[in-house]
Structure formats: structure tokens, C-alpha cells
Amino acid sequence: MSLLTEVETPIRSEWGCRCNDSSDPLVVAASIIGILHLILWILDRLFFKCIYRFFEHGLKRGPSTEGVPESMREEYRKEQQSAVDADDSHFVSIELE
């Protein structure tokens, strides 16, 4: 006799939902967490470009220039731009044989 025939199969009356007691606090908490997770996931997928662009540029602000003379601000901007321009010239060249 094979192992598959030894396993009990449920009868149709046992296939119903066994969690009829939905007043259980754990079930309520799990339902709320599941719904919130689904809502946040949908919002993330709909607005991911806006969200991550905000974090990327919002967190990359430079140091505060409050109280710094305009000439020093301009010098700092030129240094930052020259550093960016220098990084743009580094490309990896891959040649396939």
C-alpha cells in the first residue's frame, strides 16, 4: 500500500472556515495589520518614483550655508561641480571578443 493512500483526506464538511470566532483579538489585530500592509504596498507601488526621489534628493542636501559669504558659497558650488564633472569621465570599457 502506498503512502498516499494512508493519508486521511478531509471530507467536504470539514473544508469550511474554522475561524468563525472573529472576535478573537489576535484575529482582529492580524486583519488590521494585513489591511494596512496591503494599503501601504499599493501606495508604494503607485507613488514609488515620487517617494524615492524625495528621499534621494531630500537627504542629499549639502551643508547649511547660513552665515557663509556668497563668494565662499560660489567657490563651494564650483568645487562640487568639478568633482561631479571629474566623476563623469570615468567609464568602464568592456570589449567582447
From Swiss-Prot:
**Presence of keyword Ion transport:** yes
Site positions (Seems to be involved in pH gating):
41
* Organism of derivation: Influenza A virus (strain A/Memphis/110/1976 H3N2)
Q: Per UniProt, what is the membrane topology? A: Single-pass type III membrane protein
| Record's keyword terms, sorted | Disulfide bond, Glycoprotein, Host cell membrane, Host membrane, Host-virus interaction, Hydrogen ion transport, Inhibition of host autophagy by virus, Ion channel, Ion transport, Lipoprotein, Membrane, Palmitate, Phosphoprotein, Signal-anchor, Transmembrane, Transmembrane helix, Transport, Viral ion channel, Virion
* Carbohydrate attachment residues: 20
Q: Which Pfam families match?
A: Flu_M2 (PF00599)
How activity is controlled: the entry says:
The M2 protein from most influenza A strains is inhibited by amantadine and rimantadine, resulting in viral uncoating incapacity. Emergence of amantadine-resistant variants is usually rapid.
Q: Region Disordered: what ranges?
A: 60-88
What is the protein's name according to its record? Matrix protein 2
